[in-house]
C-alpha cells in the first residue's frame, strides 16, 4: 500500500504542474487521490497500449517497481504492460478503507462512478472486480436518446453523495448523444483543527497578489506551537497544521518573496516534496500564523491535461482498448469530470463559529512569524498512509 501512496503523490506533483501551465494567475485545487482512484476503475477495463499509457501517467509502474525490486525487471514489465495487478487493486481497496474510515474529527465524501452507453455490455469479471475492489457499480445509461436527462441524474447523484456541497458537476454541454463513457469524481472534505483559530482575532487585511496588486481578505491568526520546515534553496518556509486526531494535516508552503511562487512550482518534484515534508525535516516553533479564510470550488474536465501527459488512446475511438470491460468495439472515454470543494476557516474546513485559544509556552521554543498574505501552495495529507488527498495553490481571494 505504501507504493500506491507514492504513485498517487508522484501523480499529484506532475498533474499540479500540468494544471499550472494553463492556470496563470488562478487558484488550483484538486484531489490526486480522487483522480487516481476513479481512473483506476477505468484502468481495470483496459488492455494493451491504452493500459500502458494509463499506467505511465498514473505511475502504477512504481507499484510493481516497489513490489518486485530491480532484480525482477522482466516480471515487472510483463505485469505493468498487461495493465493489471491484483496487488494494485487490493492496495486501492485497503487505502480507500483507511482514508474513508469514519471518525468524529472529519467528514470525507467521495462520489466515483463510471457511466457507459447501454449498448456496451460489461464483462461479468469486470463487474465483480469493480464491486470487490472499489465498492462501485458501473452504470449503463441511454446517452443516445436521453443525454440531457442522464446529465441531470448524474448531477443529482453526485449532490446526494457529497451532502449537496457539489450539486452541479456536469455543465450543460458535458454529454450528448455521441457520448459513450463518462467518468465522474467529486470530493468534499470537512475537518476540525487540532488548534482552532479564535474568531475574535480574524480581521480584514490585504492579500498581496503581486508587488503592485492586493485584495482584502479576512485574515485569521493564532499563536501556537507548530511544526515548521525550511526550504532554504527556494527561500520558502512551510508549516504543518494538524486536524483533530492528527490523521490529516494541512501543509502550507509559503515563499518568502511575494512573487516567489513560480520559482517554487518550477523546482518542485515528488522527491523534493517528500523530503521537505518529512517529519525529520520539521522543527517545533512558537508561531504567530496569519492565514486567510477562503473557500475553493474548482471544476476540471481532465481530458486535455491527461492527453498532454501521455494518456491519449483512452480518449481515441479508433485506438482505445477497453476489452477487459466489454466485448463491444469502439468504446472510448469521452470525458473525465472532477470537482472539489474546500472551505478554510477558524474551526477548520467548513463554516462554524469556533472559540480558539492561544498557548503560553512553558518550554521556550524558537519564535517565528508566518504571514500567508501572498500566493502559496498547500496540501491536505492523510498522515496514516502518507497520501496527498488534496493539492492546491492559493493565488488570489
UniProtKB/Swiss-Prot annotation:
This is Serpin B10. A motif (Nuclear localization signal) lies at residues 74-77. Pfam families: Serpin. It is found in: Nucleus; Cytoplasm. The record marks 362-363 as: Reactive bond. Belongs to the serpin family. Ov-serpin subfamily. InterPro entries: Serpin_CS, Serpin_dom, Serpin_fam, Serpin_sf, Serpin_sf_1, Serpin_sf_2. Keywords: Cytoplasm, Nucleus, Protease inhibitor, Serine protease inhibitor. The lineage of its organism: Eukaryota, Metazoa, Chordata, Craniata, Vertebrata. One of its GO terms (biological process) is negative regulation of proteolysis. GO terms for molecular function: peptidase inhibitor activity; serine-type endopeptidase inhibitor activity. GO terms for cellular component: cytoplasm; extracellular space; nucleus. Protease inhibitor that may play a role in the regulation of protease activities during hematopoiesis and apoptosis induced by TNF. May regulate protease activities in the cytoplasm and in the nucleus. Inhibits plasmin. The keyword NADP does not apply. CDD domains: serpinB10_bomapin. The gene is Serpinb10. It comes from Rattus norvegicus (Rat). Expressed in many tissues, including brain, heart, kidney, liver, lung, prostate, skin, spleen and stomach. It comes from the Eukaryota.
Amino acid at each position: 500500500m505504501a507504493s500506491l501512496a507514492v504513485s498517487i503523490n508522484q501523480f499529484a506533483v506532475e498533474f499540479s504542474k500540468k494544471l499550472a501551465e494553463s492556470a496563470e494567475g488562478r487558484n488550483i485545487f484538486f484531489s490526486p487521490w480522487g483522480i487516481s482512484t476513479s481512473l483506476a476503475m477505468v484502468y481495470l477495463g483496459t488492455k494493451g497500449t491504452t493500459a500502458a499509457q494509463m499506467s505511465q501517467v498514473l505511475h502504477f509502474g512504481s507499484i510493481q517497481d516497489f513490489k518486485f525490486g530491480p532484480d525482477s525487471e522482466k516480471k515487472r514489465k510483463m505485469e505493468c504492460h498487461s495493465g493489471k495487478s491484483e496487488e494494485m487493486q487490493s492496495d486501492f481497496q485497503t487505502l480507500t478503507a483507511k482514508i474513508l474510515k469514519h471518525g468524529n474529527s472529519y467528514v470525507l465524501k467521495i462520489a466515483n462512478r463510471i457511466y457507459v452507453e447501454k449498448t456496451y455490455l460489461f464483462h461479468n469479471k469486470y463487474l465483480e472486480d469493480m464491486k470487490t475492489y472499489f465498492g462501485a457499480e458501473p452504470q449503463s445509461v441511454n446517452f443516445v436518446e436521453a443525454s440531457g436527462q442522464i446529465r441531470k441524474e448524474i448531477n443529482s447523484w453526485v449532490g446526494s453523495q457529497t451532502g449537496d456541497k457539489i450539486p452541479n458537476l456536469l455543465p450543460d454541454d458535458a454529454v450528448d448523444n455521441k457520448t459513450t463513457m463518462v467518468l465522474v469524481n467529486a470530493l468534499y472534505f470537512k475537518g476540525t483543527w487540532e488548534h482552532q483559530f479564535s474568531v475574535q482575532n480574524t480581521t480584514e487585511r490585504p492579500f498581496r497578489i503581486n508587488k503592485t496588486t492586493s485584495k482584502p481578505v479576512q485574515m485569521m491568526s493564532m499563536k501556537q506551537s507548530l511544526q515548521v520546515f525550511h526550504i532554504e534553496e527556494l527561500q520558502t518556509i512551510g508549516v504543518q497544521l494538524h486536524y483533530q486526531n492528527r490523521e490529516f494535516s494541512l501543509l502550507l508552503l509559503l515563499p518568502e518573496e511575494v512573487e516567489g511562487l513560480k520559482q517554487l512550482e518550477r523546482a518542485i518534484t515528488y522527491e523534493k516534496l517528500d523530503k521537505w515534508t518529512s517529519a525529520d525535516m520539521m522543527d517545533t516553533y512558537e508561531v504567530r500564523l496569519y492565514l486567510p479564510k477562503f473557500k475553493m470550488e474548482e471544476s476540471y474536465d481532465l481530458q486535455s491535461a491527461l492527453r498532454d501527459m501521455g494518456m491519449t488512446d483512452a480518449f481515441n475511438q479508433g485506438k482505445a482498448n477497453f476489452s477487459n470491460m466489454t466485448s463491444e468495439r469502439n468504446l472510448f472515454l469521452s470525458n473525465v469530470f472532477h470537482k472539489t470543494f474546500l472551505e478554510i476557516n477558524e474551526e477548520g474546513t467548513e463554516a462554524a463559529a469556533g472559540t480558539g485559544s492561544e498557548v503560553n509556552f512553558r518550554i521556550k521554543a524558537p519564535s517565528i512569524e508566518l504571514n500567508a498574505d501572498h500566493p502559496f501552495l498547500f496540501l491536505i495529507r492523510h498522515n496514516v498512509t502518507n497520501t496527498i488527498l488534496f493539492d492546491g495553490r492559493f493565488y488570489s481571494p
